[in-house]
């Protein structure tokens, strides 16, 4: 449909363009006209928009091709492509396959869409040639072979190019200017254009061949000889770029070289000359309009269309006169094309009384034999119109009895006068035959009773008349006789189809296509089918199986039917009313609806089979047996009408029959019943909130989460009471699921004193043995919560001495009351344990002096208590003895780690994870503070930071007081340092170097430091000295000193490297770059960057801002910026790897090495760099340069996975508001992860059909990505594996294997980006299908058997998860 195309292959159109196409369709415009308009819009595009549209249209063309030639041949083409076939081989193969198509409808599609698809597939191949064609650009041509143009015309062409007009449009405009010339101006322009064509020919065939052709011309060779040699030379060209030149410039050059002769020969076919001959029947006003159109540069096709429009408006004698004149023109053109001798031969054949078919065959044969290109163009230009003119008179005479006008007095006489007038107006307004037919059927469908019967008879008469015309009177009489003999409807229908299938005449086949569907409908609406169906109409049903509806609801349904709402919408409304019922009203409605379903079943399978099914049910057969028999009976139905009943009513009846049983079985676990049993501990307000959530359609998961939230808020006796109630509910569910006998067995095991592990294993075994789908759903729904409830009491009893409340009086007693209150409030507000711990450590870090010491002792006491609990008292005592014996810190630490590593109890391992990091910090703080005091901020302000201003010192002290991290303080100091210049900078550098030397001495020892100093004083090179320092630092094993290296090393390296590197790096500063590889920035952007640098913004922020400006560019501006940035990257590469290596890489690139080879060599060269400064360059500039060098290719490859394109494909299920929000997030620079999270959030909010639809769209996107990542062949292999019935595990393993084999970095990034979300999407459908009967009271009949097979693996995984917890 048009809507489908606009959302998929034409989604790149603007809303205005889409509306225009819809209007064209509604106005009855032909498919060709609409396609012409689409290609017009496409031709206006350029750059990325063009690429995006091309990709969309290519997908459409591929789908079309698959539909025409079949999947098997598409796979054959794909295999050819992957085997390395070039575009010519593929094109030839496609042409061959299309030429073998025999189906008329498919051949019509080839004719309709082939040219456009060829154009689309040719569009992208032009891109990479644009750089090499610079000597044939518009700009250079204006001073050479286009110099004859006026300045005004040149300016117009340049403006057109700037506005993104296509090459075709520019060429058309140039030829338009050329066609307007006369006399000497024309001669001059012709010479210049011929010169341009000669230059292009020389470039395409080579100078030697061009010289050979020139010599041939100068020797006096005939035009035909010369033309043949040129064609031969062009045909021998194999270079793709040059072949494109031939395609681009060939037609225009042929025109230029042929213009003088052809103008003399063609003058009698110009518009002007024709107005006095075969167009003399036009009015003066119409002639003036045509001349104006030609003057305005309208195409020949548009002029022809206008003439035929004027012709179609004529009637009677005026029409006859025009037909004769036009036939005369066609005869004249035919004589010119095939020659006078052949034309005379055809005329004699016509005069001899030859049939239309014979004559047509001979004309086609004569035209097919024409080889002259100019004459072949005549055939292309005038052939279609002449065929129409020659066909119009006969067909009008033959078809008049099927025109709208004649039909209004025969088989449409039942229409009212108003309806007849409306149809005539529609025809006058140019509405299509389809529109008129649809309107007639609409009027017919509105009829009832006798009026309907009368109309049916009239329409049947019309259909019989058409049938007689199509199959012939003899065959029609034979069919009538068969019908009268009492043959069944199926026999008659088969014979009619056979007769229609045997028709070969194209005009008659068109009748079948035009009237067949409507006649089938009319013959199907007969008395029999109406009599059979009347008891299933809405009206009759309102008094039978829909009598439970209120009068208001009945009226609403009747109104919907009157308004033309679809059957599906009516059914949905009825089920909506049904779903709103409760209690007895629900029971009553269920019985009535079941009665209706039984009545339909009886009609569909027959009374005998229905009785058999009833007996089976009454005999006590299981639901599964009964269901299998019903499915078998329905599957055996062959009557199309009855099969339609199954499709129409089957889903609803399945739902109705599933609802009662599931409600009866589950009532004791409903929310309502639970509020008085295992949820009786909730407050009334909480119960009301839950009931409201259920009423508002909240999911079961949301209700469960809310209950657990209320539970988690409880404390003390209230918590105990709730725990007992919930445990009671869990026991009740367990009993229902595993059976009373097994539940009693488990209870006895528990009472006998079995361990928690034994009991858990037995429960898991019992649950694993459950096979009933409903009960397995209970396990999935209630299992996690019940495990939580049963685990909570023990863990709370064991952990109570580590709760926040108890700790406030022991190892957290050093906190102020205000701080304690804040922590209790955070816990009450549901803050995570990590947040509470972070807050405590924040309070601790703020302490100083004795307060700090006191807190440290208390916290250490808490850590010792936890350690004792985790490793046991015996091991804790052993560790204490080791400490007291004077063991070193390293020995003690190793023993503690060993003891912790030996812990196997999961709860205790959780303690290690929860409290370990904080305790390590507490135990490390006291010693390190004592040893590090001479490197504190306070002491440093008077030594190596004395160069700071007082204001800066105060700022640093304030930051420390506010709890800022050491990294932030260091960054601030380096910021102040970077702002300095001149002597101030030198002074600060010396002070900081002094600090670094002091730290180095502390870390490596005085002896090693003195050794390094001597090495430096001896004149050792920077590299030698650096190597020795690295060696000394590497030899450090003390953890505290290694921390010093980590903390101060980077800054000291910077300070020591700053003077030299500043001298060496000046050519890569922001300031110098603004005049080189950043010169493409606007002055405003440059000023902004300088301001950012002045404000102390980091290099990363400046780089991000530059890339932001770059990403905003488009077209030529983007190209220019890319070139400048690439130049900067090349300069940096040369500096990093050296000029020799850079030259080697450039030679490799120029030799035509692949992108992969070049990339590998660059990576190898960078990997070999050992100089730290240069390695820093790689770290600083590498990512951006990779982006710049990768931007064109990756943008072209990835555009089909952009947010914008996805909104019309696999994200089309989002609301407009949601789409706008995502686009805004992208515009605001939100990360891909954030966008993905938002999309999944929207997805998670969906339910029912909306969820299913979204899942299918997202799965489609995932399949598209998978195909891109692993390749079409591998994707097809995976699809075949899935279709063969492979298990989920097998399929998953194969997908993982395929993904693991991917080595391309870009594709691996796709896996990283989209893999997690796609795994989630593919997981959601199965789980929803498994739970379907537990959520809305129906059984997933179709998936029942498959889900049993899958669940065994699922529960194994589920048990593994439970075992982990």
UniProtKB/Swiss-Prot annotation:
> Recorded GO terms, molecular function?
retinol binding
Its keywords, alphabetically, are: Allergen, Cleavage on pair of basic residues, Lipid-binding, Repeat, Retinol-binding
**Which residues fall in a coiled-coil region?**
none
The keyword Repeat appears for this protein: yes
Question: Member of which family?
Answer: Belongs to the NPA family.
Query: What's this chain's function?
Result: Has high binding affinity for fatty acids and retinoids.
This chain belongs to which protein, by name?
Polyprotein ABA-1
Q: Which organism is it from?
A: Ascaris suum (Pig roundworm)
Which lineage do the record's taxonomy fields give for this organism? Eukaryota, Metazoa, Ecdysozoa, Nematoda, Chromadorea
Gene name tied to this protein: ABA-1
């Amino acid at each position: 449909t048009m809507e489908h195309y606009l959302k998929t292959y034409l989604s790149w159109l603007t809303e205005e363009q889409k509306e225009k196409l819809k209007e064209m369709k509604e106005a009855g415009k032909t498919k060709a006209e609409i396609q012409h308009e689409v290609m017009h819009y496409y031709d206006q595009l350029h750059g990325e928009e063009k690429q995006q549209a091309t990709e969309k249209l290519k997908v459409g063309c591929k789908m079309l091709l698959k539909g025409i030639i079949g999947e098997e041949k598409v796979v054959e083409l794909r295999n050819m492509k992957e085997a390395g076939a070039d575009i010519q081989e593929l094109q030839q193969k496609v042409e061959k396959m299309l030429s073998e198509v025999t189906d008329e409808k498919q051949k019509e599609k080839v004719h309709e869409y082939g040219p456009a698809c060829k154009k689309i597939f040719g569009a992208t191949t032009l891109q990479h040639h644009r750089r090499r064609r610079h000597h044939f650009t518009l700009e250079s041509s204006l001073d050479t072979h286009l110099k004859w143009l006026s300045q005004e015309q040149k300016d117009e062409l340049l403006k057109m190019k700037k506005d993104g007009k296509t090459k075709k449009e520019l060429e058309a405009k140039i030829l338009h200017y050329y066609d307007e010339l006369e006399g000497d101006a024309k001669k001059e322009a012709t010479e210049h254009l011929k010169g341009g064509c000669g230059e292009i020919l020389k470039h395409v065939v080579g100078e030697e061949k061009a010289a050979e052709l020139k010599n041939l011309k100068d020797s006096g060779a005939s035009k035909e000889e010369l033309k043949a040699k040129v064609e031969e030379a062009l045909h021998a060209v194999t270079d793709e770029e040059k072949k494109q030149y031939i395609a681009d410039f060939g037609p225009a050059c042929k025109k230029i070289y042929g213009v003088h002769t052809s103008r003399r020969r063609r003058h009698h076919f110009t518009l002007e000359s024709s107005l006095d001959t075969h167009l003399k029947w036009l009015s003066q006003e119409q002639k003036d309009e045509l001349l104006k159109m030609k003057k305005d540069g309208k195409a020949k096709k548009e002029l022809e269309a206008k003439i035929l429009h004027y012709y179609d408006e004529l009637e009677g004698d005026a029409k006859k006169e025009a037909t004769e004149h036009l036939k005369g023109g066609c005869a004249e053109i035919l004589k010119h094309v095939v020659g006078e001798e052949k034309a005379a031969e055809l005329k004699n054949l016509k005069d001899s009384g030859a049939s239309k078919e014979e004559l047509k065959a001979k004309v086609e044969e004569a035209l097919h034999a024409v080889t002259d290109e100019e004459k072949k163009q005549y055939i292309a230009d005038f052939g279609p119109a002449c065929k129409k003119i020659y066909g119009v008179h006969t067909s009008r005479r033959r078809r008049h009895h099927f025109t709208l006008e004649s039909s209004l007095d025969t088989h449409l006489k039942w229409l009212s006068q108003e309806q007849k007038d409306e149809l005539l107006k529609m025809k006058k307004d140019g509405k299509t035959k389809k529109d008129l037919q649809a309107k007639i059927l609409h009027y017919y469908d509105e009829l009832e009773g006798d009026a309907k019967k009368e109309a049916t008879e009239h329409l049947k008469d019309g259909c019989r008349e058409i049938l007689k015309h199509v199959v012939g009177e003899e065959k029609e009489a034979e069919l009538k006789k068969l019908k009268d003999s009492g043959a069944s409807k199926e026999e008659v229908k088969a014979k009619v189809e056979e007769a229609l299938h045997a028709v070969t005449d194209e005009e008659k086949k068109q009748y079948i296509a035009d009237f067949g569907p409507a006649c089938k409908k009319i013959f199907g609406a007969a008395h029999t089918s109406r009599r059979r169906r009347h008891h299933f109409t809405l009206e009759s049903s309102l008094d039978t199986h829909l009598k439970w509806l209120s009068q208001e609801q009945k009226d609403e349904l009747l109104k919907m039917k009157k308004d033309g709402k679809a059957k599906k919408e009516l059914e949905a409304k009825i089920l909506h009313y049904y779903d709103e019922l409760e209690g007895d009203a629900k029971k009553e409605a269920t019985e009535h609806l079941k009665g209706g379903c039984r009545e339909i079943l009886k009609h569909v399978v027959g009374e005998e089979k229905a009785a058999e099914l009833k007996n089976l049910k009454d005999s006590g057969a299981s639901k599964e047996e009964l269901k299998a028999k019903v499915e078998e009976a329905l599957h055996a139905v062959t009557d199309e009408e009855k099969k339609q009943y199954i499709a129409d009513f089957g889903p609803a009846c399945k739902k109705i029959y599933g609802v009662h049983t599931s409600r009866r079985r589950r009532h004791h676990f409903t929310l309502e019943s639970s509020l008085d049993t295992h949820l009786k501990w909730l407050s009334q307000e909480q119960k009301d909130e839950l009931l409201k959530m259920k009423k508002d359609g909240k999911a079961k998961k949301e209700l469960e989460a809310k209950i657990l939230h209320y539970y988690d808020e409880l404390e003390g006796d209230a918590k105990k009471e709730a725990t007992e109630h919930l445990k009671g509910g869990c026991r009740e569910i367990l009993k229902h699921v595993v059976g009373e006998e097994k539940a009693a067995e488990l209870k006895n095991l528990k009472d006998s004193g079995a361990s928690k592990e034994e009991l858990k294993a037995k429960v898991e075994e019992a649950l694993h043995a459950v096979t009933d789908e409903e009960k397995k759903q209970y396990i999935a729904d209630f299992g996690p919560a019940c495990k939580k409830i049963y685990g909570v009491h023990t863990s709370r009893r064991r952990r109570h001495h580590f709760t926040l409340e108890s700790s406030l009086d022991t190892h957290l007693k050093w906190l102020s009351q205000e701080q304690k209150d804040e922590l209790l409030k955070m816990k009450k507000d549901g803050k995570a344990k990590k947040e509470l711990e972070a807050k405590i450590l924040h309070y601790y870090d703020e302490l100083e002096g004795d307060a700090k010491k006191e807190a440290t002792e208390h916290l250490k006491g808490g850590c010792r208590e936890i350690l004792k609990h985790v490793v046991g008292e015996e091991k804790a005592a052993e560790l204490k003895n080791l400490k007291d014996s004077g063991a070193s810190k390293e020995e003690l630490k190793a023993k503690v780690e060993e003891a912790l590593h030996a812990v196997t109890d999961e709860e205790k391992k959780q303690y290690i994870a929860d409290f370990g990091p904080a305790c390590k910090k507490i135990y490390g703080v006291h010693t390190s503070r004592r040893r590090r005091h001479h490197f504190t901020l306070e002491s440093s302000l008077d030594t190596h930071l004395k160069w700071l201003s007082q204001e800066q010192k105060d700022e640093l002290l304030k930051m420390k007081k506010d709890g800022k991290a050491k990294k932030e303080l260091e960054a601030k100091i380096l910021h102040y340092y970077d702002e300095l210049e001149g002597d101030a900078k030198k002074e600060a550098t010396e002070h900081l170097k002094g600090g670094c030397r002091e730290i180095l001495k502390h870390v490596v020892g005085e002896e090693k430091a003195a050794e390094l100093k001597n090495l430096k004083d001896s004149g050792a090179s920077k590299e030698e000295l650096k190597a020795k320092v690295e060696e000394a630092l590497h030899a450090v094993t003390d953890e505290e000193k290694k921390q010093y290296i980590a903390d101060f090393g980077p800054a000291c390296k910077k300070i020591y490297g700053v003077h030299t590197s500043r001298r060496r790096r000046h050519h890569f500063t922001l300031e110098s770059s603004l005049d080189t590889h950043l010169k493409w920035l606007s002055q405003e952007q440059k000023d902004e960057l300088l301001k950012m640098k002045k404000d102390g913004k980091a290099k990363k922020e400046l780089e991000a801002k530059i890339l932001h400006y770059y990403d905003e560019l488009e077209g030529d501006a983007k190209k220019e910026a890319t070139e400048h940035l690439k130049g900067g990257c090349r300069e940096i590469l040369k500096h990093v790897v050296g000029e020799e290596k850079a030259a080697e890489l450039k030679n490799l690139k120029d030799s035509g090495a692949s992108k992969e080879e070049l990339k590998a060599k660059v990576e190898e060269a960078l990997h070999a760099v050992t100089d730290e400064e240069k390695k820093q360059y790689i770290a600083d500039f590498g990512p951006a340069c990779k982006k710049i060098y990768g931007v064109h290719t990756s943008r072209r490859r990835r555009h089909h996975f952009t947010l914008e394109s996805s909104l019309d494909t696999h994200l089309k299920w989002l609301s407009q508001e949601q789409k706008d929000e995502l686009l805004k997030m992208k515009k605001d620079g939100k990360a891909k992860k954030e966008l993905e999270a938002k999309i999944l959030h929207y997805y998670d909010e969906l339910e029912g059909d909306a969820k299913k639809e979204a899942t299918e769209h997202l799965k489609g996107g995932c399949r598209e990505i998978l195909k891109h990542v692993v390749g079409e062949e591998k994707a097809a292999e995976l699809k075949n594996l899935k279709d063969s019935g492979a298990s989920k595990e097998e399929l998953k393993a194969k997908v993982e294997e395929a993904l693991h084999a991917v080595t391309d970095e870009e594709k691996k990034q796709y896996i990283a980006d989209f893999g997690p979300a796609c795994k989630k999407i593919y997981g959601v459908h199965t789980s929803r299908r498994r739970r379907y009967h537990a959520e809305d009271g129906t059984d997933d009949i179709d998936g029942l058997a498959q889900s049993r097979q899958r669940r065994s693996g699922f529960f194994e995984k589920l048990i593994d998860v439970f075992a982990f917890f």
